[in-house]
């Protein structure tokens, strides 16, 4: 499948297996889901997970279990990642680990923008994040 993220960024969605339920024909349930985002600056982001859902109408992608994402520099690992084309945001949550050229961090939830490389970090229950910055 092909879709658009943020109205002008193309992406492709694929999987090993997929099925559609009659009661919700716009949602495709996938096994070994793989999305490739093509960013304006030429970078390519690969997002993979053991399970996931793709909405053909909204282009939203929901990844579950063993989520891995990378743009070649930044690497993200988590249990869940929601690529919300309808909101122009990536929500990453549950056991999030993010490594990037100048450091690494662990958190419960990160809202990440692949285009700008900005992220907002939060913890459930007001706990502190664990972050390491390398100069």
Which residue stretches match the model-derived regions?
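Mature-chain termini and adjacent capping regions
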Residues: 1-135
């Amino acid at each position: 499948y092909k879709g658009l993220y943020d109205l002008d960024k193309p992406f492709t969605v694929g999987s090993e297996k997929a099925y559609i339920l009659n009661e919700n024909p716009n949602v495709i349930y996938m096994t070994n889901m793989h999305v490739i985002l093509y960013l304006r600056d030429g970078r390519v982001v690969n997002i993979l997970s053991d399970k996931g859902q793709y909405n053909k109408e909204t282009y939203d992608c929901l990844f579950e279990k063993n989520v891995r994402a990378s743009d070649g520099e930044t690497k993200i690992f988590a249990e869940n990642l929601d690529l919300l084309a309808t909101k122009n945001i990536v929500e990453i949550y549950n056991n999030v680990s993010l490594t990037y050229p100048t450091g690494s961090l662990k958190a419960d939830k990160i809202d990440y923008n692949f285009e700008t490389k900005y992220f907002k970090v939060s913890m459930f229950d007001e706990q502190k994040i664990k972050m390491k910055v390398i100069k």
